[in-house]
Regions:
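Noncatalytic alpha-helical scaffold of FAD-dependent oxidoreductases
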Residues: 1-168
Length: 168
């Protein structure tokens, strides 16, 4: 199609991308609130939190439009979660919220990662430690009312998982 348009319009269309995709994605240095981290380590299992760069990157953007995808592909994100926590229960949630209040830490919810709520647009002026709260391990059906066709589910359940559990 490009050669046809070039010939008809007598112009040359440059097909080289304006930006080159970044081969290695970078994340900023972590902003650590040490007293908060010490309590996290004592209250949560080791597999419930991570500082790993790829997880921090994944939990610092959504897929809510080309703007977010562009920023990831071309290293244009300016703010990243400092820590990712995977909550597994209501008790975990309550503990985490209380610790965040106590230590003045910013919590950001992470569901499926699409960012339809824009919660993952982390404000670049935020100076506190930012913790991404991943709810995907909260993936159970809490209750079912077959008569009224109502289901109460945990925050991290996906449509596919819900369908599978309802089939049982």
């Amino acid at each position: 199609l490009v050669p046809f348009v070039e010939k008809i319009l007598a112009i040359e269309i440059k097909t080289e991308p304006y930006f080159k995709e970044a081969k290695k994605k970078y994340v900023t240095d972590k902003n650590i609130n040490q007293p908060f981290l010490d309590e996290i380590k004592s209250e949560f299992k080791d597999d419930q939190y991570t500082f790993e760069d790829n997880e921090r990157l994944l939990h610092s953007h959504g897929q809510n439009g080309p703007d977010e995808v562009f920023k990831v592909l071309y290293n244009k994100l300016q703010k990243f979660a400092d820590l990712v926590i995977y909550i597994e229960s209501d008790e975990d949630t309550e503990k985490l919220i209380n610790l965040a209040i106590k230590h003045d830490v910013c919590l950001v919810p992470f569901g499926g990662g699409t960012n339809v709520t824009n919660a993952l647009k982390l404000p670049k002026q935020e100076s506190r430690m930012i913790v991404s709260v991943d709810t995907r391990r909260l993936d159970k059906i809490e209750s079912m009312d077959k008569k009224n066709l109502l289901v109460t589910v945990q925050a991290g359940i996906t449509g596919k998982s819900l369908e599978e559990q309802l089939q049982k």
